[in-house]
Regions:
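Actinobacteria-biased recognition of intrinsically disordered, low-complexity terminal regions
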Residues: 1-38, 180-190
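N-terminal secretory signal peptides and thylakoid transit peptides that target proteins
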Residues: 186-208
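N-terminal signal-anchor transmembrane alpha helix
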Residues: 39-63
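Structured, non-membrane catalytic/scaffold regions adjacent to prosthetic-group chemistry
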Residues: 57, 61, 66, 99, ...
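Extended acidic/polar, glycine-enriched regions
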Residues: 209-212, 219
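Juxtamembrane/transmembrane-helix boundary motifs in multi-pass membrane proteins
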Residues: 31-39, 96, 142, 146-150, ...
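Alpha-helical transmembrane segments of integral membrane proteins
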Residues: 35, 39, 43, 47, ...
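Hydrophobic alpha-helical segments
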Residues: 52-55, 68-180
């Protein structure tokens, strides 16, 4: 039974003591909500994605090399130690570039997440940090060989959009009002605030998803446009010297063997370009200079008027692991390099030709490999089609007998006749051999690794594979299982010393 006075309520007082509460007791203060750190981090990541998305979209007008992720990734590739590159290529093969982009995205997400957390309490320094990230990317864009000062505009535009986006999203997550609740505030307003918070977070998430879609779409359009540009670009000129017909016996009749001629879409790609360069054949030129009597400069139309040679050549990457697939055989069409060097007049004392790509890559090609009887080409065609963009369109080097790192320059723009003592190439400055002759190699293609064997009726399993030794050819292949005897394999028909042989 209660006396006259205020009705009592049970509960815990502000000071932590339990007991009945009367109207005279002060109501607990309603503390303002603060955005959790994880939501602040999300704001930073989304703002960073907006920067990339806008820059990728703008790069459609400037070319893929102006995109910040491509430029920064290319700069990273240029400075990492060669041993790390070897390890990455050995582990991931042709997946090396996607792995690099994924790793870059993780690092970028961590950096922008920290910027977002900083923005929750110090918005101005956070905005400056995000702007600094954009400035860093712009500086790297300027260092890329094929870029001009205008190529910073996509990243600049992305930064100008991302910084206010960061501040707007921060405000949305923290709430729509800046007034501090008082002791007299009605608790019924809390659900409305929570609902607004949830709506804001959903909006932040949608902005992030949209940014990812735009960035991925722009990157896909950039890549697809490069491939489409080379389709039906021109009609391949007829060769003056056609490649010898490939005999039927060159392809070993064994299920699971790769085709003797590697299709363009399956041909391995290893290079330092994270995005296929934009090369306009209408403005492309090749400069031949250095230790020559007469400097030459040819445009693409003039090059196509030169006598063409067609030949079968197997190319191999020096990073190809045992049993690896970083080797391919194709039929190439192009201009013999020696004819242009003879026209330029190579001076005494020269022993190397430094080939340069539009993206700045260089290769040190021994002069004799371009002037002897081998079919070293300025290739414009591959397997009866215009050279694919990812394989060097409009012009690339094909030099039989040398690993790609010293010969297979794609998107070629320059040949400098020089000396090994005077110039060094991209990979030789990183400790690699100057000359890079291909070593004899063989691999087992059938059965593939981890395949469940299916012996025939006599309990035998047939092995098949490929061997190559460019400029020398394959005379025999011997196979040994465990500690058994060496057994000579049956070879497919020989095509040339510059192509692989199936067995």
């Amino acid at each position: 039974m209660s006396g006259r006075g205020a009705p009592a309520t049970d509960g815990e007082h502000e000071d932590g003591t339990a007991g009945p509460r009367s109207r005279s007791d002060p109501a607990p203060a309603h503390r303002p909500e603060r955005s959790p750190r994880r939501w602040s981090a999300l704001v930073g990541v989304v703002a960073g994605l907006v920067l990339v998305a806008v820059a990728e979209l703008a790069s459609l007008a400037f070319g893929s090399s102006s995109a910040p992720f491509v430029a920064v990734g290319g700069g990273f590739v240029d400075v990492i130690p060669p041993a790390v590159k070897d390890l990455v290529i050995g582990l991931f093969g042709t997946w090396d570039k996607p792995i690099l982009f994924a790793s870059m995205f993780v690092v970028y997400a961590l950096i922008t997440a920290m910027i977002g957390q900083l923005a929750s309490s110090r918005p101005v320094p956070a905005a400056a940090a995000l702007g600094g990230l954009g400035l860093f990317a712009m500086a790297v864009v300027l260092t890329r060989a094929q870029n001009t000062p205008l190529d910073v505009l996509p990243t600049l535009l992305g930064t100008l959009v991302a910084v206010p986006t960061l501040l707007l999203l921060r405000r949305a997550v923290r709430g729509t009002t800046g007034a501090e609740p008082t002791a007299s505030s009605e608790p019924t307003g809390a659900p409305d605030a929570a609902w607004l918070r949830r709506r804001s977070l959903v909006g932040v998430g949608l902005v992030g998803v949209l940014a990812v879609v735009v960035a991925a779409g722009a990157r896909g359009v950039n890549a697809g446009r490069e491939r489409a540009r080379q389709v039906a670009r021109f009609v391949l000129p007829a060769p003056r010297e056609s490649a010898a017909p490939i005999p039927a016996g060159a392809q070993v009749d064994l299920t699971g063997m790769p085709p003797f001629v590697t299709p363009n879409d399956d041909f391995y790609r290893i290079d330092t370009a994270l995005a296929v360069p934009n090369v306009d054949p209408g403005t492309w030129t090749l400069r031949i200079h250095g230790l020559v009597d007469e400097e030459l400069e040819l445009d693409f139309a003039a090059l196509l008027e030169e006598p063409m040679t067609e030949t079968h050549v197997t190319l191999t990457c020096v990073s190809n692991a045992v049993g690896g697939d970083l080797a391919g055989n194709a039929t190439w069409l192009g201009v013999p390099v020696r004819t242009l060097l003879e026209r330029a007049g190579v001076q005494d004392g020269a022993d190397m030709v430094l080939s340069r790509s539009i993206d700045g890559f260089t290769a040190s090609i021994p002069l004799e490999a371009l002037t002897d009887s081998r079919d070293s080409l300025l290739a414009v065609g591959m397997n009866g089609q215009p050279l694919p963009a990812e394989h060097g369109y409009p012009v690339r080097m094909v030099v039989p007998g040398l690993y790609g790192y010293v010969s297979a320059t794609k998107w070629l723009t320059e040949l400098k006749v020089t000396r090994f003592a005077d110039d060094t190439a991209y990979w030789t400055t990183r400790g690699w051999s100057e000359r890079g002759p291909i070593k004899i190699a063989s691999r087992i293609d059938v059965p593939r690794s981890f395949t469940e064997l299916a012996p025939d009726s006599e309990g035998a399993v047939t092995l098949g594979g490929t061997a190559w030794a460019q400029q020398r050819g394959i005379a025999a292949v011997e196979v040994r299982i465990d500690d058994g005897d060496w057994r000579e394999a049956e070879l497919g028909a020989d095509v040339s010393a510059d192509t692989w042989t199936q067995w």
